[in-house]
Regions:
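Intrinsically disordered, low-complexity segments enriched in polar/charged residues with Gly/Pro
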Residues: 16, 48-50, 69
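Active-site Tyr-X1-5-Lys
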Residues: 1-27, 32, 56-66
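A local structural micro-motif
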Residues: 22, 71-72
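Glycine-rich "substrate-gating" loop/helix at the edge of Rossmann-like oxidoreductase active sites
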Residues: 27-54, 74-86
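Alpha-helical substrate-binding/gating segment
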Residues: 57-71, 82-100
Length: 100
């Protein structure tokens, strides 16, 4: 619902105020390193893990790393788009370099 409302508000501001808007829907971002963070280990992004509510990919990675069976909640029929952090950063960079 909120993404739909966002789109309607963006359309409104574009038509009424001539605001140029780029809205990026990238899915779930995974990974911890980018070219910038590779320059210094103190810049590495956090790897958040939450057994119940965290990103399924992070949960699966943690469970696999410790030899724990992968836990699937619900029916297992959920689908989500995943994008690596390097690709996400590149997407934002391209959007900034090519405004509407």
């Amino acid at each position: 619902m909120t993404k739909t409302l966002d789109q309607l508000l963006f359309l409104y501001y574009n038509k009424n105020d001539k605001v140029r808007i780029t809205d990026l829907h990238q899915g779930i971002v995974w990974g911890t390193n980018t070219d910038a963070t590779d320059r210094d280990p103190r810049l590495t992004n956090r790897f958040d893990y939450d057994g119940d509510y965290g990103t399924v990919l992070n949960r699966f990675l943690m469970q696999a790393a410790i030899g724990y069976p992968l836990t699937v909640h619900g029916t297992g029929g959920q689908t989500r788009a995943f994008i690596h952090i390097r690709d996400s950063v590149r997407c934002v960079q391209l959007a900034l370099e090519n405004p509407p």
